[in-house]
């Protein structure tokens, strides 16, 4: 599908729960964790069981959600790059790499967005 719909999305947005990333350990094995933003995904990746991380990582679910729902093709590609070298990484090293890449991307997006007003 060639589309420009991702270009109009703000990757820092919070999506509705129905579009959130739902963690599973296996098909039909929902663990009750849903993420509705990149920040929530990075946080959840540090806490969920390694079986859930591996399940989704091997299927390409993280990249697909980031690309199709969040609208961040660049981060999805960075996750694809981790997948390509994953045979050399342990499960925990892979988890750490995913979290690091997501957090770096969040910072890049926040800087690009400019200063915000907190109040």
Q: What name fits each language-model region?
A:
Residues 1-119:
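Terminal, compositionally biased segments used for targeting/anchoring and flexible tails
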